[in-house]
Amino acid sequence: MAKAPIRARKRVRKTVSDGVAHIHASFNNTIVTITDRQGNALGWATAGGSGFRGSRKSTPFAAQVAAERCAEAVKEYGIKNLEVMVKGPGPGRESTIRALNAAGFRITNITDVTPIPHNGCRPPKKRRV
C-alpha cells in the first residue's frame, strides 16, 4: 500500500513589537534570552556557545558577542522595544546591554532581578588561591 506524501507544515512567524531580554551574568558565563511579554522564548545565545571557552567565556567581550548573536536570532520577529532584566554579578552585565542597544533595539527600562537571600543558605567558603 502506498503511503501518502508527507507535507511539511508552514511555520507561521509571529510578529512581536515588544520583548524582554533576560540576561543571566554569572562569574563563568553569560546567557542572553529574548522572550515576548508572556515569557515565551524567541531566541537565546550564550558566551560559551559563541565560541568562547575557559576563562575567555567570562569576559565582557564574550557577553557582547552573545548579545549580538541573540539579537540576530530574533530580528525576524520584528522586535523594536526591549525591556532588560539583569540577573547575577558577572562581568557581562553592562556590555550585554550596550550590545543590545547597538543592535537597534530601543531599551525601555532596565531591571535588576538578582536574587538576594534574606539570610538563607550559607554561602560557599572563601577561595584560597
Curated annotation (Swiss-Prot):
Query: Which Cys pairs are S-S linked?
Result: none
**Molecular function terms, GO-annotated:** rRNA binding; structural constituent of ribosome
Question: Which domain of life does this protein belong to?
Answer: Bacteria
InterPro entries linked = Ribosomal_uS11, Ribosomal_uS11_bac-type, Ribosomal_uS11_CS, Ribosomal_uS11_sf
Q: Which UniProt key words apply to this protein?
A: Ribonucleoprotein, Ribosomal protein, RNA-binding, rRNA-binding
Entry's Gene Ontology BP terms: translation
Q: List the record's Gene Ontology CC terms alphabetically.
A: ribonucleoprotein complex; ribosome
- A Pfam family assignment: Ribosomal_S11
Which HAMAP family has this protein been placed in?
A: Ribosomal_uS11
| Record note on quaternary structure | Part of the 30S ribosomal subunit. Interacts with proteins S7 and S18. Binds to IF-3.
Report the function annotation for this chain: Located on the platform of the 30S subunit, it bridges several disparate RNA helices of the 16S rRNA. Forms part of the Shine-Dalgarno cleft in the 70S ribosome.
Which protein family is named in the record?
A: Belongs to the universal ribosomal protein uS11 family.
Protein name according to UniProt: Small ribosomal subunit protein uS11
- UniProt source species: Yersinia pestis (strain Pestoides F)
Instruction: Write the gene name.
Output: rpsK
